Structures are given as structure tokens and as C-alpha cells.
Amino acid sequence: VEAQWNSDLLLVDEIAKDLRSCLDGEGRPVFSFSVSYQNHGPYEWTYTANETYLDPKTSGLPEESCYVFNNYLHGANITISAMTLLAQQLEEMEEPVVLVLFGDHKPWGGNSNDAYYGIGASFDTTALEGFYQYYATPYLIWANSAAKETLGREFRGEGGDFSPCFLMPELFEQCGWTGPSFLQ
């Protein structure tokens, strides 16, 4: 995968480099909050820029929807490669490292979210299912082997549904930390 100017591949290299620099001889905890925008929309809706994942003829979706999803999925593929690389670099570290990844909103789905409606998504936020389809985003709490050993947890399984603003308290709970009361 080739890096572009705003690529997550460049971002994860900087994160790992900065983390190593902060940990050299310090022996203190390090907190890093990094925001990626490599795959932020809007996505091109008049053509597919790279790989074709969805084709109008085989998917039954309109061309514009296929273009939006194809361009989003290409970026998602780069992001997955970059985050996998970051996890591999963090796994090699002797220090305990816990990584939290989350999305803050759904990818752009075309004007008026037409691409989503084409795949049957309901964004009727007055209904619980529509609310979740519109607002829900995935998150991942991952730990390297050193953190698993230090914290005595495997960091496996599924977490609950909650707003990203509650990820810090969830992280504290998963790590067995108490911290300031405003983080609990």
C-alpha cells in the first residue's frame, strides 16, 4: 500500500516514533491522542479512484453509491493496514501499551446519505434501530503482551454500546485504574 500525503501509514510511523522517544529513559506513563483524517469524506461520487469493490451490475446499487463505497473502502483498506502495522510495532515494545481506536461518526454516504439508503440502512433516529445505524461507530481496545501481563487481562471480547465520550472511563475500568473521579 502506497502512502499519500495524508496517509494513516505516515501517521502511525509518527505515533510509534514519538512514543519511543517519550519512553526512552523516562519510565513515566505516556498518553498520546492522535486524530486521523486520511479516509475522511466526502468521497468521490462520480468515479472509482482505485479498487472496485462494488459494481452497479453485480450489486444492483446505483453507480454513485458504488463510487462512494469503493472510494471509502479503498481508504479503509489503507487504514486497516496502517493500524495493523502500528499494533505490530507496539507489540514489539517491552513497555506495556494499550491502544484505543474509535470512529467519531459514520463515513459520508453521499448527498442526503443516498448510498446508505441504497443498502437498506435506516436513519430514522426516532426508532432505536435507526438511531444505532446512524450514530453507532466501532471501537477497539487493544493491548500488547507486556500490558496484558502487567494488567492481568487478555483484552478479548466485546464491549458495550456507549458514546465515544465514555471511552476513557471504559479504558480505566479495563486497565483496573481509578484515576481522578471525573474519569470514573
Predicted regions and their residues:
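Solvent-exposed soluble domains appended to multi-pass membrane proteins
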Residues: 1-184
